[in-house]
From Swiss-Prot:
<dbReference type="InterPro" id="IPR001452">
    <property type="entry name" value="SH3_domain"/>
</dbReference>
<dbReference type="GO" id="GO:0032580">
    <property type="term" value="C:Golgi cisterna membrane"/>
</dbReference>
<keyword id="KW-1015">Disulfide bond</keyword>
<dbReference type="GO" id="GO:0018279">
    <property type="term" value="P:protein N-linked glycosylation via asparagine"/>
</dbReference>
<dbReference type="Pfam" id="PF14604">
    <property type="entry name" value="SH3_9"/>
</dbReference>
<feature type="disulfide bond">
    <location>
        <begin position="212"/>
        <end position="230"/>
    </location>
</feature>
<keyword id="KW-0729">SH3-binding</keyword>
<keyword id="KW-0728">SH3 domain</keyword>
<keyword id="KW-0472">Membrane</keyword>
<feature type="disulfide bond">
    <location>
        <begin position="218"/>
        <end position="222"/>
    </location>
</feature>
<keyword id="KW-1133">Transmembrane helix</keyword>
<feature type="disulfide bond">
    <location>
        <begin position="464"/>
        <end position="471"/>
    </location>
</feature>
<dbReference type="InterPro" id="IPR035653">
    <property type="entry name" value="Fut8_SH3"/>
</dbReference>
<protein>
    <recommendedName>
        <fullName>Alpha-(1,6)-fucosyltransferase</fullName>
        <ecNumber>2.4.1.68</ecNumber>
    </recommendedName>
</protein>
<keyword id="KW-0328">Glycosyltransferase</keyword>
<feature type="domain" description="GT23">
    <location>
        <begin position="206"/>
        <end position="492"/>
    </location>
</feature>
<feature type="domain" description="SH3">
    <location>
        <begin position="501"/>
        <end position="562"/>
    </location>
</feature>
Length: 574
C-alpha cells in the first residue's frame, strides 16, 4: 500500500470541509431572500468572508498539488510536515464553520445588546435632561442662574462620561477588542514588510531611487514630516528612498547617528540617469529622481495625505477611526526606529521620571509660534481637558494618581503649572531649556524633543494644539501603539492635518438650513471641504457644490475616505 493513501484522505477531508463551509454560506444567502433588508446589510460582510475562504481554499489546493509525488522512492520528512499543516488547517476550518453557525444563528452577543440598549437609553435620558434644565434656566436670574448653570454643566458631564464609558465597553464586547488588536497588528506587519522590501533592493545599482534631503528650513517635527512625505511618494512610485542627511542641523553626522538607517542595502544615490521630479509618468525612465519640498511639488501625485491605499481601505475603515493618520503613522514608525544608545536614553528617562499609567500628555508650544501660527493658551485651558479625561478614565480603571507629562519650550511654565496644580506633573525642565530658540538646533535639543515626543505618544490621552508639528508627530506615533487611538486627544486649535496635504473633504449625511448668515446650507451627499472644527458643535468649511463658505453642525457630516491605487508589493510576501 502506498504511504500517501492516508495523506490523500486528509486532503480530501479538508477540501470537503471547505466546500461544506462555502455551501453553508451560499445556503445562508438563499435562506435570507425572504428578508431582503437583512441580506443587504449582511451581504458585504458575507462576500468578504467568502473571498477570504476562496483564497484559503486555493492555498490548500496548491498544497495538495505539492503532495503529488511520482512513483518511486519517497522522502517522507517534508511531506509529513505538510500533512500536519493540513491537519491544522482542518481544525481551523471546523472552528470557522462552528463560529459562523453560531454568529448567523444567535446574532450578536448578550453583552453587546445590553450595552447597545444602555447607550440608547442614555441618549434619551440626556435629551430629557437637557430639555428640562434649559426650561428651568429661562426663569432664573442673577446668582441663581449662575449656580444652576454650573450644576447643569456638572450633571451634563456625568451624562456624557456615562455614555462614553458604555461605548468603550461596547467596543470591547463579544471579542471585538481582541479582533481589533489582531487586525491592527496584522495590518501593521503587512505594511512594514512592504516598506522593508522596497527599502532593501537586492541590487542597489539597478534600483529606481527617490532622493530626499532632510535639511528643510524648519524644526524637527517639520523635518520629520518632510521625510514622511518623501517616503510616501517613494512608496507610491516604487522607488527606494535615499535620505540625504549629512550636516543635518540637529546632528552633523546625519540621521543614522540617531535612528536606524532607512535601508540596509541601498544608501547610494548613484544611477545611470538623474533628474528633478517632473511627475510619475515623465520620470518613468529616470533611475534617480530628486524630490523638492512639498510646497514646490509640481505636478502633485495622488499619493499625498490624506489618501490611503485602495487595497487596505476597507480593513482600515473597520479597525481605525482615522485611516489617513494610521497610514502616515506607518512611515513614521519605520523612520524613527532608534539606535541602541537612544533606546537606552529613553529607558533611563522613563525610570528617572517615574513615568507610568495612567498619564495624560500635555504639550504647550510658546516662543516663536505664539502670535504667528498659534494663539496663546494659558495652562488652565489645557487642564480643563486633563481633568475631564481623568474623570472618564476613573469610570473604567483605578486612577491612583493624576499624572501629567508636560512638554513645552517655555522653561518658566513647569514652575507655574506645579504651583497651580501641585503633585500632577512629571517632567524634565532641562528639555524645556534645550527647546528654547537659543538652543533649538543642537544635539542636546534633538535628544530633548525626541524624549518629549516619546512620552507624549505613550500617554493615555493627549492635550495640545495641532498647529504644532511636535504634537501631531506624537499623535501619529500614538496610533502605532494602540489598535485605534484616533480619539485619544483634544486639540485647542486645529484638527489633524499633514502639511501639504490634498483637500480634506467631508460628506453631508443630514440636510442643514442656515439660521444665521454665518452658516451654509447642506443637502445629503454634498461635499464639504473642511477648514476646521470650532469644538463647539460647529465646523467651518466650503460647500463645494454651492461654493459657499461658512459654519455647519459637525454631526451632520462624515469623513470622505480618499483611496489611491498604491502598489501592493506582492514580492514582500515571498
Amino acid at each position: 500500500m502506498r504511504p500517501w493513501t492516508g495523506s490523500w484522505r486528509w486532503i480530501m477531508l479538508i477540501l470537503f470541509a471547505w466546500g461544506t463551509l462555502l455551501f453553508y454560506i451560499g445556503g445562508h444567502l438563499v435562506r435570507d431572500n425572504d428578508r431582503p433588508d437583512h441580506s443587504s446589510r449582511e451581504l458585504s460582510k458575507i462576500l468578504a468572508k467568502l473571498e477570504r475562504l476562496k483564497q484559503q481554499n486555493e492555498d490548500l489546493r496548491r498544497m495538495a498539488e505539492s503532495l503529488r509525488i511520482p512513483e518511486g522512492p519517497i522522502d517522507q520528512g517534508p511531506a509529513i510536515g505538510r500533512v500536519r499543516v493540513l491537519e491544522e488547517q482542518l481544525v481551523k476550518a471546523k472552528e470557522q464553520i462552528e463560529n459562523y453557525k453560531k454568529q448567523t444563528r444567535n446574532g450578536l452577543g448578550k453583552d453587546h445588546e445590553i450595552l447597545r440598549r444602555r447607550i440608547e437609553n442614555g441618549a434619551k435620558e440626556l435629551w430629557f435632561f437637557l430639555q428640562s434644565e434649559l426650561k428651568k434656566l429661562k426663569n432664573l436670574e442673577g446668582n441663581e442662574l449662575q449656580r444652576h448653570a454650573d450644576e447643569f454643566l456638572l450633571d451634563l458631564g456625568h451624562h456624557e462620561r456615562s455614555i462614553m464609558t458604555d461605548l468603550y465597553y461596547l467596543s470591547q464586547t463579544d471579542g471585538a477588542g481582541d479582533w481589533r488588536e489582531k487586525e491592527a497588528k496584522d495590518l501593521t506587519e503587512l505594511v512594514q514588510r512592504r516598506i522593508t522590501y522596497l527599502q532593501n533592493p537586492k541590487d542597489c545599482s539597478k534600483a529606481k531611487k527617490l532622493v530626499c534631503n532632510i535639511n528643510k528650513g524648519c524644526g524637527y517635527g517639520c523635518q520629520l514630516h518632510h521625510v514622511v512625505y518623501c517616503f510616501m511618494i517613494a512608496y507610491g512610485t516604487q522607488r527606494t528612498l535615499i535620505l540625504e542627511s549629512q550636516n543635518w542641523r540637529y546632528a552633523t553626522g546625519g540621521w543614522e547617528t540617531v535612528f536606524r538607517p532607512v535601508s540596509e542595502t541601498c544608501t547610494d544615490r548613484s544611477g545611470i540617469s538623474t533628474g528633478h521630479w517632473s511627475g510619475e509618468v515623465k520620470d518613468k525612465n529616470v533611475q534617480v529622481v530628486e524630490l523638492p519640498i512639498v510646497d514646490s511639488l509640481h505636478p502633485r501625485p495622488p499619493y499625498l495625505p490624506l489618501a490611503v491605499p485602495e487595497d487596505l481601505a476597507d480593513r482600515l475603515v473597520r479597525v481605525h477611526g482615522d485611516p489617513a493618520v494610521w497610514w502616515v503613522s506607518q512611515f513614521v514608525k519605520y523612520l524613527i526606529r532608534p539606535q541602541p544608545w537612544l533606546e537606552k536614553e529613553i529607558e533611563e528617562a522613563t525610570r528617572k521620571l517615574g513615568f507610568k499609567h495612567p498619564v495624560i500628555g500635555v504639550h504647550v508650544r510658546r516662543t516663536d509660534k505664539v502670535g504667528t501660527e498659534a494663539a496663546f493658551h494659558p495652562i488652565e485651558e489645557y487642564m480643563v481637558h486633563v481633568e475631564e479625561h481623568f474623570q472618564l478614565l476613573a469610570r473604567r480603571m483605578q486612577v491612583d494618581k493624576k499624572r501629567v507629562y508636560l512638554a513645552t519650550d517655555d522653561p518658566s511654565l513647569l514652575k507655574e503649572a506645579k504651583t497651580k496644580y501641585p503633585n500632577y506633573f512629571i517632567s524634565d525642565n532641562s528639555i524645556s531649556w534645550s527647546a528654547g530658540l537659543h538652543n533649538r538646533y543642537t544635539e542636546n535639543s534633538l535628544r530633548g524633543v525626541i524624549l518629549d515626543i516619546h512620552f507624549l505618544s505613550q500617554a493615555d490621552f493627549l492635550v495640545c494644539t495641532f498647529s504644532s508639528q511636535v504634537c501631531r508627530v506624537a499623535y501619529e506615533i500614538m496610533q502605532t501603539l494602540h489598535p485605534d487611538a484616533s480619539a485619544n486627544f483634544h486639540s485647542l486649535d486645529d484638527i489633524y492635518y499633514f502639511g501639504g496635504q490634498n483637500a480634506h473633504n467631508q460628506i453631508a449625511i443630514y440636510a442643514h438650513q442656515p439660521r444665521t448668515a454665518d452658516e451654509i446650507p447642506m443637502e445629503p451627499g454634498d461635499i464639504i471641504g473642511v477648514a476646521g472644527n470650532h469644538w463647539d458643535g460647529y465646523s467651518k468649511g466650503v460647500n463645494r457644490k454651492l461654493g459657499r463658505t461658512g459654519l455647519y453642525p459637525s454631526y451632520k457630516v462624515r469623513e470622505k475616505i480618499e483611496t489611491v491605487k498604491y502598489p501592493t508589493y506582492p514580492e514582500a510576501e515571498k
